[in-house]
A protein has these predicted regions:
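Intrinsic-disorder/low-complexity, polar/charged segments enriched in Ser/Thr/Lys/Arg/Asp/Glu/Gln
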Residues: 3-7, 42, 52, 80-82, ...
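Hydrophobic/aromatic beta-strand elements that line small-molecule binding cavities or substrate pockets
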Residues: 8, 53-59, 71, 82-89
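Short beta-strand-to-loop capping motifs
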Residues: 10-12, 47, 101-103
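Short coil/turn motifs at beta-sheet boundaries
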Residues: 1, 48, 62, 78-80, ...
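Residue-level signal for tight coil/turn positions that link beta-strands
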Residues: 5, 12, 40, 62-64, ...
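Beta-strand/loop substructures that line and gate deep hydrophobic ligand-binding cavities in soluble
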Residues: 73-129
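Hydrophobic ligand-binding cavity/cleft-lining segments
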Residues: 1-37
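Glycine-rich portal/gate segments that line the openings of hydrophobic small-molecule binding cavities
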Residues: 25-76, 96
Length: 129
């Protein structure tokens, strides 16, 4: 199993960043996803270059600004996927996102990491708009 981690400082309040990420039906910050459908705690979408993906939302905690989800259906056989996004205040008008993803088999780690990086850039674009 590989554990990926990104820690990023954003020029917005923690509350504003949480508003973007806690809306699990929102896809404007993920460049490879056009739309998301929700059924209970499951979100499904088509991801460019990947295909149909279904994720289970395990935790969407407003108080601790933590989102946790797991890919449970993907075109490729993934034995384990667990992503956690934690937001904290980093002072006046700034927020820190710590995003970790556990992935197994490790062969998928580079692709998952690339997806994290382009999504972080997507978040920055949403904040700036």
């Amino acid at each position: 199993m590989k554990i990926l981690k990104e820690e990023v400082l954003f020029n917005c309040s923690a509350k504003d960043l949480w508003t973007i990420l806690s809306d699990v039906s929102r896809s404007d910050w993920v460049p490879s996803i056009e739309s998301i459908s929700l059924t209970g705690n499951l979100r499904s979408f088509e991801m460019d270059g990947i295909g149909s993906v279904t994720e289970e939302i395990l935790l969407n905690d407003d108080q601790n600004m933590t989102l946790q989800y797991s890919a449970i259906k993907t075109p490729s056989k993934i034995d384990h996927h667990l992503a956690t996004m934690r937001i904290s205040s980093a002072g006046e008008g700034q927020a820190t996102l710590i995003w970790t993803t556990e992935i197994d088999p490790e062969i998928f780690a580079d692709g998952v990491h690339h997806g994290m990086l382009i999504s972080i850039e997507g978040i920055k674009k949403v904040i700036e708009s």
